[in-house]
């Protein structure tokens, strides 16, 4: 087992017990590493060196500047928690997934690259409102994640086309055809 000794002065525990005043007086820097069974056991420190170390620790505990900043600069505003119904509930129009929904979806095995759009959320809510089923909030989020995964994958990851747009003819001639 390796250990780090923080002083060059090393003494056995028997020598320290026999004459601790002489050992500490000869110690460079007022500190001695005490070994027992060929391994470091503890450090013996003179009262003067202990006072120096405590003064240094107190000095380091104080701020390095005399400028005092307002406590409000250190306090981040608390986000107003969204009221999520306890237990199981039916889907309602104002339901929202949690702010860390994408991270949670990844934990459930659904990798979402983009957050849920308002259209996707509205479609999900409308469908499940009509169903009238009840689930816990986490279960609703899991259903939303799976719904997004299936919906986005069904079109090769592309957004759904608007059926009201007028299609434009392709002006390129495929290879092998004459133009």
From Swiss-Prot:
Q: Which UniProt keywords apply?
A: DNA replication, DNA-binding, Primosome
What residue intervals traverse the membrane? Answer: none
Query: Per its UniProt record, what Gene3D superfamilies does this chain match?
Result: 1.10.8.1180
Q: Provide the coiled-coil residue spans.
A: none
User: What is one term from the GO cellular component aspect held by the record?
Assistant: primosome complex
Query: Which example biological process does GO assign this protein?
Result: DNA replication, synthesis of primer
> Has UniProt tagged this entry with the keyword DNA-binding?
yes
Q: Where is this region: Disordered?
A: 156-179
Q: Which family does it belong to?
A: Belongs to the DnaT family.
What role is this protein assigned?
Involved in the restart of stalled replication forks, which reloads the replicative helicase on sites other than the origin of replication. Can function in multiple replication restart pathways. Displaces ssDNA from a PriB-ssDNA complex. Probably forms a spiral filament on ssDNA.
What subunit structure does UniProt give?
A: Homooligomerizes. Interacts with PriB. Component of the replication restart primosome. Primosome assembly occurs via a 'hand-off' mechanism. PriA binds to replication forks, subsequently PriB then DnaT bind; DnaT then displaces ssDNA to generate the helicase loading substrate.
UniProt-recorded name of the protein: Replication restart protein DnaT
Q: Which organism is it from?
A: Escherichia coli O157:H7
Q: Which gene encodes it?
A: dnaT
């Amino acid at each position: 087992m390796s250990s780090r000794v923080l002083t060059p002065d090393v003494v056995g525990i028997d020598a320290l017990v026999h004459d601790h005043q002489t050992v500490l007086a000869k110690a460079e820097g007022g500190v001695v590493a005490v070994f027992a069974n060929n391994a470091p056991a503890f450090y013996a420190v003179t009262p003067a060196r202990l006072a120096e170390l405590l003064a240094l620790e107190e000095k380091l505990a104080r701020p390095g500047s005399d400028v005092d900043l307002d406590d409000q600069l250190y306090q981040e505003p608390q986000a107003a928690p969204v009221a999520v119904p306890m237990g199981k509930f039916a889907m309602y129009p104002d339901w929202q997934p949690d702010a860390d929904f994408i991270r949670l979806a990844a934990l459930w095995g659904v990798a979402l690259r983009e957050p849920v759009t308002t259209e996707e959320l509205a479609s999900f809510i409308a469908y499940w409102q009509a169903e009238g089923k009840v689930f816990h909030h986490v279960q609703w989020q899991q259903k939303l994640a799976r719904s997004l995964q299936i919906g986005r994958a069904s079109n090769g990851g592309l957004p759904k086309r608007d059926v009201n747009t007028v299609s434009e003819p392709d002006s390129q001639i495929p290879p092998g055809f004459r133009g």
